[in-house]
Amino acid sequence: MNKTTLHDQWVVKAPVNDVFEIMTDFEKFPKNFPKVAESIRVNRRVGNYVEMEATVRSFGKRFQVKMNYQILPGKGFISDNDSYQFGTSGHEEMKLCQHPKGTLIDYTYQVTIHNKWLGIIAVPLLRWYSMKYWEKAVIDQLKKILEK
């Protein structure tokens, strides 16, 4: 198994609660962030815990992901994800806090690649490409929605 941690931070010129509302409205992800989410089905919601399945896009492919989210009210979320089809699993954290210019998004994704040979190729590619793609597909889109 190969593991890598991806991390970045961005500032969005909007209040924390506005960012939180969009980033935890999972059912609207396909509409708000079509470059990464094709479809999402919430299977179970109990309090701040959400179990869902999604068809996501990455590296020019579509694949299924099972996600278990813990919503941190007003602060972001923590998620454990399993992409059995792509051969990866991950632990994702998105934390929000006030910033003089709006909201600071602190995003970390710890990825485990279960296929040894895929890991040799994928780890360098993930480190180089993933956060740039996430910024373009999610953060830039979030800014378009909120910074009108």
Language model features: what each stretch is:
Residues 6, 50, 70, 137-139, ...:
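A generic structural signal for ordered secondary structure
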Residues 1-47:
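Hydrophobic ligand-binding cavity/cleft-lining segments
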Residues 111-148:
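A conserved amphipathic terminal alpha-helix motif
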